[in-house]
Structures are given as C-alpha cells and as structure tokens.
A protein has these predicted regions:
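Short, ordered coil/turn segments that flank beta-strands lining enzyme active or ligand-binding pockets
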Residues: 5, 20
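Short secondary-structure junctions
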Residues: 6-15
C-alpha cells in the first residue's frame, strides 16, 4: 500500500516462511511518506515503521497528534524541554521518551486513546477493578 502511494520500502517487508503456518514478515522500514498516506492514517499491527520528515519539534508533535489513533507515541531527544512537553501533549495512551514505543511493565495500565482504545485499560489496578466483582458478605455462625 505504501509503495503504491510513492513511499519507498527501504528494507524488509518480505513474507517469511516458517515451520509454523502463519503470516510472517520481515520488519519493514518505509521512507518518503506523508501524513496523508494510508500507512500513516491506519493502525498497522506489524513490524512496520514509516518515516515522515518534519522541519522542527512543533511540526513533529502536530503530525504525531494528527491521527484518529493513539495507542503509543515516542520521542528521541536530548532536550529535557521537548521531552517534558511531549509527555504532556502527545495524544496517546502510552508515551515513551528515548525508549521503544512497544511494551510496558505489567503493573501499569495498558491502552490507547482515540480510536486505539476499546474498553477499560488492561493490566495494573484498572484491570483489577474491571475484572473483579466486589461483594460484601456476613455470616453469623
């Protein structure tokens, strides 16, 4: 899809054959993309990364938030000012600074914002509250 819209498949993306049946692909890196392209407008669950060139931090934050989805967002920076601002203003359920955007500790809530979220947060106390039915019972023996 990205290549049909003039994105460049820099590496990966080929289907892999494995002993176990399934749909496996090599991690793909796609460059020369724009915010309007499908690769950047749809939620892709696979080992795919696309690159959108921006001129500065403000444009990067605007591009990151210009999506109907918001599972996770991340920034790589040496600027404490940008790191702090990004954590507060990125419209995502999980925000990482100088870390991968996948994976969180089991004790913290997991979930997205906007169209990336469905139902309550998984993991952490939010999950405990959702999956637990509280009952108070008394017995006089």
């Amino acid at each position: 899809v990205a290549q049909a819209e003039c994105g460049t498949l820099l590496c990966g993306g080929q289907r892999l054959q494995r002993e176990t049946e399934g749909y496996y692909m090599a991690p793909a890196l796609i460059t020369d993309t724009t915010p309007a392209m499908r690769i950047n407008r749809e939620e892709v669950f696979g080992p795919v990364a696309s690159v959108i060139r921006v001129k500065d931090y403000d444009e990067a934050l605007a591009v990151a938030n210009d999506t109907p989805f918001g599972l996770s967002a991340g920034i790589a920076t040496t600027s404490l000012k940008h790191a702090t601002h990004f954590k507060r203003h990125a419209q995502a359920g999980m925000v990482m600074v100088n870390l991968p955007t996948a994976g969180v500790d089991y004790h913290v809530p997991f979930g997205g914002r906007k169209a990336s979220s469905y139902g309550p947060r998984e993991q952490g106390r939010y999950a405990q509250e959702f999956f637990t039915t509280v009952k108070t019972a008394y017995t006089l023996a």
